[in-house]
From Swiss-Prot:
Assembly description: Part of the 30S ribosomal subunit. Contacts protein S5. The interaction surface between S4 and S5 is involved in control of translational fidelity.
CDD domains: S4
Record keyword Transferase present: no
SMART domains xrefs: Ribosomal_S4, S4
Species the sequence originates in: Aeromonas salmonicida (strain A449)
Protein name: Small ribosomal subunit protein uS4
PROSITE patterns: RIBOSOMAL_S4, S4
The protein's role, per its UniProt record: One of the primary rRNA binding proteins, it binds directly to 16S rRNA where it nucleates assembly of the body of the 30S subunit. With S5 and S12 plays an important role in translational accuracy.
Gene this chain is encoded by: rpsD
One Gene Ontology molecular-function label: structural constituent of ribosome
Domain (S4 RNA-binding) ranges: 96-156
Keywords: Ribonucleoprotein, Ribosomal protein, RNA-binding, rRNA-binding
Record-level GO BP terms: ribosomal small subunit biogenesis; translation
Length: 206
């Protein structure tokens, strides 16, 4: 399955919440009716079954992190094998993706842009170029923008936008050096309360 390249606002409207697929600090509900699904009949809301609710939650999280269906299922399997809460393990695996860490550090305005930076070899981990967006970053790893990419206007613009957002506590960033440290895995309380990972666990447990 190919990645979705259509209108980003349409995906957020489909899920009824801001998926943070657009750059900027202004909430997208100020731009469009976020609680109304796209399309001619978007205002009609059918009552979802339990399965439908679980499926929507899975799709929402998958779209937030820009992960394809097969990848997402593999993440769930890995999370289920680990000790502890499967849902929290899943979120930590998604948060540990290099493209997501680049986004959290502010080098990319969106996860999609951060994925592109990684793919274009603009990012280094512990002094080595890594061009795999799904690369798992470990605690204490140092992530930085490659020297020849530091002049890119989009990276500078992203850091300015990131400066206006609430900073994640599990990463530490030196904006001047365009370098950051992944201090620890985020705890559940660090992440969005809008995500109900238990619904995803229930979906895949069937």
């Amino acid at each position: 399955m190919a990645r979705y390249i259509g209108p980003k606002l349409k995906l957020s409207r489909r899920e009824g919440t801001d998926l943070f697929l657009k750059s900027g600090v202004r909430a997208i509900d100020s731009k469009c009716k976020i609680d109304t699904a796209p399309g001619q009949h978007g205002a009609r809301k059918a009552r979802l079954s339990d399965y439908g609710v679980q499926l929507r939650e899975k799709q929402k999280v998958r779209r937030i992190y820009g992960v394809l269906e097969k990848q997402f299922r593999n993440y769930y399997r890995d999370a289920a094998r680990q000790k502890g809460n499967t849902g929290e393990n899943l979120l930590q695996l998604l948060e540990g993706r290099l493209d997501n860490v680049v986004y959290r550090m502010g080098f990319g305005a969106t996860r999609a842009e951060s994925r592109q930076l990684v793919s274009h070899k603009a990012i280094m981990v512990n002094g080595r170029v890594v061009n795999i967006p799904s690369f798992q970053v470990s605690p204490e790893d140092v992530v930085c923008v490659r020297e020849k990419a530091k002049k890119q206007a989009r990276i500078k613009a992203s850091l300015e936008v990131a400066g206006q957002r609430e900073k994640p506590t599990w990463v530490e960033v030196d904006t001047a050096k365009m370098e950051g440290a992944f201090k620890r895995l985020p705890e559940r309380s660090d992440l969005s309360a809008d995500i109900n990972e238990q619904l995803i666990v229930e979906l895949y447990s069937k």
